[in-house]
């Protein structure tokens, strides 16, 4: 390696010279251009002899500024008693060899002093025996002897693993470099000559200057048993395990102290201040006090664990025992955090003044914002700390398995918290921004959102899938979609909770994360959830809202709406024997026996004849009734023995019970209507109700025809649906038209203004010419 290459490598490794973006073909010219203004030289002498140059020009613009910088460097070199060059030798480049000799002498003179400085033993040019592996300076090797000594030294340390400790901070300037902080332990993966080594820190591999670190001797090395194999490392493992555990305790104490300081110094005084209302302060605070108290409890528990002998430590077990509290505290905090950020945004000026009056540094709002976000950062830190502890823990340690379980639990909790925060932020956005095509009262009047998620839905038998955002309130389910430009949300409809029937489809149809919503007031909807967690949450919340005294057992998994109606009433009655009729407690009306709408108008034909035949034949055999009832879906396959029993007395008893239920309802209906007749109950037959409909065809011809009530209702339903769609399209077209008109108006005004200015300028120019 020639002197120019060695000097380039030396200056880059010291951090006083920036790495070139491309490979240097001529190191001498590179040095001339880099050192000409004297800034690099002043940085160098300050690095070698701190305080040698108090002030120098960082951005010299003139020759005098450059010469002054060079003179400052030469003054510092005088204390090293080396032969110096003239300032003009460097600035003009005429006698650059003297500059090189001076720099080489400075390096040699400071070699012994740098053993205690960031450059270390490798900072000298004699140690930089090869090219820099950072792809900026490519130089050949000239000292294989020292390289072989380093490799031999690594072999003696065990498993060819060289471990170093950072003595000073180093910030990466390229993507392939590694940023290190003072005290970091780096596992060297590649030793190259030239002052740059490759190593791994916290799972990231990159290049770092070798003279910024020092090698850890085997006697002082706190290594993990998993990092070295082939020799006894129990004392080293114990040493580093203790260090990591103490780090966990120290950071936990500091975290608890920061939370307590924020609560006492800022949040509690803010409560007595008039900047925020009671509701806003509650949103800002959330469950911060509970989190603060819990962290102090956790800190005490970990301290108690550390007092036992090392082989009896139960850090993982302690965290697992407290994991339910962790989950409840942090999930609640994450759910409230978007609302707290909204309060911070709305009252940023007032809160900033308050924080600064309380002693916070400017800007005060930043202190409050970052402090309220610390629980999230700490939650992520738990995973890293526990992984580090597990790395330096023996596999036979009694707490090893609990540590692994705790790592998984914290990773899961961290993911849940992130998802919950995103969901709540989206929910807050929906509630705070106007919704396009919204119908009815404001969405805020519906109360709090119980659950919200993005789903994919299908209408009826339609195979087309649509993305929707479902918002569940206590009384209604709101359906929204993203606007075409993804700038907001559009209203797509709502489903009342009353009368809603929810069925799981994962069990019935074998589809994962799917359920259906049906009811008398809504068309069948199939909902596909994104994951099983959302699916379980939807089923739990919908079951809770729809399953009750007024829902009439709407969650029963039967395919027949009429059967589900009858059986649901029986579930609300008093306990009775197998053949006793139910005792009707709630008021009953004839409308309760109205049949569900058929899938097609012709499905109800012959209903009266079938009913009369059923009631006539039921007196002869109970089995006759069973033939005309909807077949029930079996939950599981019955064995042969169960099948035989089913065909015997159980079948007769069940059929008789169904018949008694129907007869009881008919009797109750007759009683409520004030009649005591034993005849067949009056049933509304939509197909027999005829209406005279006058229609006008497209050709202008008027036709009068007779239609059944069912046909008329379905025709009206289709017309209403078409009208709604047309109305929605007209609203969208109107909005687009208004927007286009506004844009056109702005454009016209702009053109008129430009035209007016042109006319004025032309008239003024003509006037000046005439004058």
UniProtKB/Swiss-Prot annotation:
Biased composition (Low complexity): 122-131, 556-572
Domain PH: 442-547
GO MF annotations, alphabetized: guanyl-nucleotide exchange factor activity
One Pfam family in the UniProt entry: PH
Gene3D superfamilies: Calponin-like domain (1.10.418.10), Dbl homology (DH) domain (1.20.900.10), L1 transposable element, trimerization domain (1.20.5.390), Pleckstrin-homology domain (PH domain)/Phosphotyrosine-binding domain (PTB) (2.30.29.30), SH3 Domains (2.30.30.40)
Keywords per UniProt: Cell projection, Guanine-nucleotide releasing factor, Phosphoprotein, SH3 domain
Gene Ontology, cellular component aspect: cell-cell junction; lamellipodium
Modification type Phosphoserine: residues: 126, 224, 487, 639, 679
Tissue spec. comment: Detected in adult heart, spleen, lung, skeletal muscle, kidney and testis. Detected throughout embryogenesis.
Residue span of region Disordered: 115-157, 556-580
InterPro entries associated with the record: AlphaPIX_SH3, CH_dom, CH_dom_sf, DBL_dom_sf, DH_dom, GDS_CDC24_CS, GEF6/7_CC, PH-like_dom_sf
Sequence ranges assigned to domain Calponin-homology (CH) in this UniProt record: 1-111
Domain of life: Eukaryota
Protein function: Acts as a RAC1 guanine nucleotide exchange factor (GEF).
The protein's name in its UniProt record: Rho guanine nucleotide exchange factor 6
Organism listed in the record: Mus musculus
UniProt gene name: Arhgef6
């Amino acid at each position: 390696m020639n002197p120019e290459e060695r000097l380039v490598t030396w200056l880059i490794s010291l951090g006083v010279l920036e790495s070139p973006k491309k490979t240097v073909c001529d190191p001498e010219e590179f040095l001339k251009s880099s050192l000409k203004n004297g800034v690099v030289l002043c940085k160098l002498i300050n690095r070698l002899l701190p305080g040698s140059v108090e002030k120098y020009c960082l951005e010299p613009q003139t020759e005098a500024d450059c010469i002054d910088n060079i003179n400052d460097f030469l003054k510092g070199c005088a204390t090293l008693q080396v032969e110096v060059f003239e300032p003009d030798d460097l600035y003009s480049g005429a006698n650059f060899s003297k500059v090189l000799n001076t720099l080489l002498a400075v390096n040699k003179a400071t070699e012994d002093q740098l053993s205690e400085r960031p450059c270390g033993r490798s900072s000298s040019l004699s140690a930089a025996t090869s090219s820099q592996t950072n792809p900026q300076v490519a130089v050949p090797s000239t000292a294989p002897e020292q390289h072989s000594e380093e490799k031999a030294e690594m072999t003696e340390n065990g498993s060819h693993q060289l471990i170093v400790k950072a003595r000073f901070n180093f910030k990466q300037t390229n993507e392939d470099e590694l940023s290190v902080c003072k005290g970091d332990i780096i596992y060297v993966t590649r030793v190259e000559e030239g002052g740059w080594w490759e190593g791994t820190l916290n799972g990231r591999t990159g290049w770092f200057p070798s003279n910024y670190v020092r090698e850890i001797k085997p006697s002082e090395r706190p290594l993990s048993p998993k990092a070295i194999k082939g020799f006894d490392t129990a004392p080293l493992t114990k040493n580093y395990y203790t260090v990591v555990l103490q780090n966990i305790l120290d950071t936990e104490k500091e975290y608890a102290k920061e939370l307590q300081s924020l609560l006492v110094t800022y949040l509690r005084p803010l409560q007595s201040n008039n900047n925020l209302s009671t509701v806003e302060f509650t949103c800002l605070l959330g469950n911060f006090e509970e989190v603060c108290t819990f962290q102090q409890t956790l800190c005490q528990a970990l301290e108690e664990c550390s007092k036992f002998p090392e082989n009896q430590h139960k850090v993982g077990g302690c965290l697992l025992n407290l994991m339910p509290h962790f989950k409840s505290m942090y999930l609640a905090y994450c759910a409230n955090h978007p609302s707290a950020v909204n309060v911070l945004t709305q009252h940023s000026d007032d809160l900033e003044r308050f924080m600064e009056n309380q002693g916070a540094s400017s800007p005060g709002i930043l202190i409050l914002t970052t402090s309220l976000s610390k629980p999230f950062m700490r939650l992520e830190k738990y995973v890293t700390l526990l992984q580090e502890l597990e790395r330096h823990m023996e596999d036979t340690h009694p707490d090893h398995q609990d540590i692994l379980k705790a790592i998984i639990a914290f990773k899961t909790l961290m993911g849940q918290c992130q998802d919950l925060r995103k969901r709540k932020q989206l929910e807050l956005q929906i509630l705070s921004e106007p919704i396009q095509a919204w119908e009815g009262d404001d969405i805020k009047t519906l109360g709090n959102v119980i659950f919200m998620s993005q789903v994919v839905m299908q209408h009826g038998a339609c195979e087309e899938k649509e993305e929707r955002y479902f918002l569940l309130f206590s009384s209604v389910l709101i359906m929204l979609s993203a606007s075409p430009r993804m700038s907001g949300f559009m209203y797509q409809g709502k489903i009342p909770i009353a009368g809603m029937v929810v069925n799981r489809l994962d069990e019935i149809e074998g589809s994962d994360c799917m359920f259906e919503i049906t009811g008398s007031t809504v068309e069948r909807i199939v909902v596909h959830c994104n994951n099983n967690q959302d699916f379980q949450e939807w089923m739990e919340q919908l079951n809770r809202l729809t399953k009750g005294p007024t829902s009439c057992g709407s969650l029963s998994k039967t395919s027949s709406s009429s059967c589900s109606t009858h059986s649901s009433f029986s579930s609300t009655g008093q306990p009775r024997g197998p053949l006793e009729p139910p005792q009707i407690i709630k008021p009953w009306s004839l409308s309760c026996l109205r049949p569900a709408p058929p899938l097609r108008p012709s499905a109800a034909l012959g209903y009266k004849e079938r009913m009369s035949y059923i009631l006539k034949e039921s007196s002869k055999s109970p089995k006759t009734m069973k033939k005309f009832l909807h077949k029930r879906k079996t939950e599981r396959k019955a064995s042969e023995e169960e099948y035989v029993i089913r065909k015997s007395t159980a079948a007769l008893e069940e059929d008789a019970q169904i018949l008694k239920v129907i007869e009881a309802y008919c009797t109750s209906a007759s009683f409520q209507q004030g009649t005591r007749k034993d005849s067949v109950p009056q049933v509304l037959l939509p197909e027999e109700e005829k209406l005279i409909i006058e229609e006008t065809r497209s050709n202008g011809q008027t036709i009068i025809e007779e239609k059944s009530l069912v046909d008329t209702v379905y025709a009206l339903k289709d017309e209403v649906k078409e009208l709604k769609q047309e109305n929605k399209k007209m609203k969208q077209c109107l909005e687009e038209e208004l927007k286009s008109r506004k844009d056109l108006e702005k454009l016209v005004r702009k053109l008129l203004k430009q035209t007016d200015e042109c006319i004025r300028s032309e008239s003024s120019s003509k006037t000046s010419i005439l004058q």
